[in-house]
Amino acid sequence: MVRPANKILIRKNKRRTSKGVIHVQASFNNTIITITDVRGQVISWSSAGASGFKAAKKSTPFAAQIAAENALRVLIDQGMKQAEVMLSGPGRGRDTALRAIINSGIQLSFVRDVTPMPHNGCRAPKKRRV
């Protein structure tokens, strides 16, 4: 089952920041949430795997929601009030993670989708045959 996040990774010097950036990377296998200040220094991070989900359960929307709540718990303790959200990747947990961020009470200045899209660059991998 899901274990509570008692050990959330925090930098040793607890800097008070009023504004930050929340990066949500949603792949097909996992969802990783990284919270940085405006200069890019990591304040906290969490993922579905670090929140206690294993194997195929890491890719579920519920796992992304729990990972976002675990990462945002540090922000609320540090007093962050405003954040920007950068969504990346095609995973199933991106909308649920965004919903958890909105419900946390942090004021969002904007939400941006920064998923890299090729302009017909490299050849795509072959289709799966099951």
From Swiss-Prot:
Subcellular location: Plastid, Chloroplast
Lineage: Eukaryota, Viridiplantae, Streptophyta, Zygnematophyceae, Zygnematophycidae
Assembly with partners or alone: Part of the 30S ribosomal subunit.
Keywords for the protein's UniProt record, in alphabetical order: Chloroplast, Plastid, Ribonucleoprotein, Ribosomal protein, RNA-binding, rRNA-binding
Family: Belongs to the universal ribosomal protein uS11 family.
Keyword Protein biosynthesis carried by entry: no
Gene Ontology molecular function: rRNA binding; structural constituent of ribosome
InterPro entries to which the protein is assigned, alphabetical: Ribosomal_uS11, Ribosomal_uS11_bac-type, Ribosomal_uS11_CS, Ribosomal_uS11_sf
Superkingdom, taxonomy of origin: Eukaryota
Gene3D superfamilies named among the record's database cross-references: Ribosomal protein S11
Organism expressing this protein natively: Zygnema circumcarinatum (Green alga)
Name of encoding gene: rps11
GO biological process annotation, one example: translation
Protein name, UniProt field: Small ribosomal subunit protein uS11c
GO cellular component annotations of the record: chloroplast; ribonucleoprotein complex; ribosome
PROSITE patterns reported for this sequence: RIBOSOMAL_S11
Pfam families, per database record: Ribosomal_S11
Keyword rRNA-binding found: yes
